[in-house]
């Protein structure tokens, strides 16, 4: 697990997520190595590259991000054949016009999500709670390193894509 820190400090929300993840890992008998990285895009990229060589799976949690138990459990599922899972997060602020529009139209969207914009766009559904991602700036994600390395070798690309680097 790679956790982003600022001024050598971890957000309380993020720390709570890490503690919950450790409890779930202990219950399942799974090892979980936690490393901290400064909130610098170059350092994050280097940390990810280094751990791709040694870890089966990387779980990346940006500063201030909180993962609920269901998300943590998704991180620990096998997800055979999947390279990465991203966990959409809410962008700051409420779009009250969008909220009003949803209420007036009788939207089936959960009321607690109306008027919110997310950092990830999805397309077709793959399975329960799993969708193809069309665009993302996710601040929490999971990578099956072997699948990603295999895909990189097919494309003869040994480094992380510049697109990913720009988003960090």
State where each predicted segment sits.
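N-terminal anchoring/stem segment of glycosyltransferases
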Residues: 1-54
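Conserved beta-strand segments of the P-loop GTPase G domain that flank and frequently precede/overlap
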Residues: 3-5, 62, 86-87
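Residue-level marker for beta-strand->alpha-helix junctions and adjacent short loops that shape enzyme
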Residues: 7-9, 65-66, 91-92
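Broad hydrophobic/π-residue packing in well-ordered secondary structure
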Residues: 26, 30, 54-57, 71, ...
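Amphipathic coiled-coil/heptad-repeat helices and related helical stalk/stem segments
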Residues: 43-44, 68-71, 161
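Short beta-strand-to-loop acidic/aromatic patch adjacent to the donor-nucleotide binding site
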Residues: 55-66
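Conserved catalytic core of nucleotide-sugar-dependent glycosyltransferases
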Residues: 68-157
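Acidic donor-binding loop at a coil-to-helix junction in glycosyltransferase catalytic cores
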Residues: 158-166
């Amino acid at each position: 697990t790679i956790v982003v820190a600022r001024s050598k400090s971890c957000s309380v929300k993020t720390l709570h997520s890490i503690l919950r993840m450790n409890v779930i890992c202990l219950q399942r008998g799974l090892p979980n190595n936690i490393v901290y990285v400064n909130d610098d895009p170059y350092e994050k990229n280097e940390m990810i590259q280094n751990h791709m060589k040694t870890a089966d799976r990387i779980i990346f949690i940006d500063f201030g991000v909180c993962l609920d138990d269901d998300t943590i459990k998704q991180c620990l599922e096998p997800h055979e054949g999947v390279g990465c899972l991203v966990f959409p997060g809410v962008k700051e602020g409420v779009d009250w016009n969008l909220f009003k529009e949803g209420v007036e139209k009788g939207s089936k969207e959960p009321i607690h999500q109306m008027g919110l914009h997310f950092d990830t766009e999805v397309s077709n559904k793959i399975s329960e709670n799993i969708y193809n991602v069309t665009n993302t700036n996710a601040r929490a994600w999971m990578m099956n390193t072997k699948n990603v390395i295999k895909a990189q070798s097919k494309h003869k690309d040994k480094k992380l894509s510049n697109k990913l680097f720009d988003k960090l």
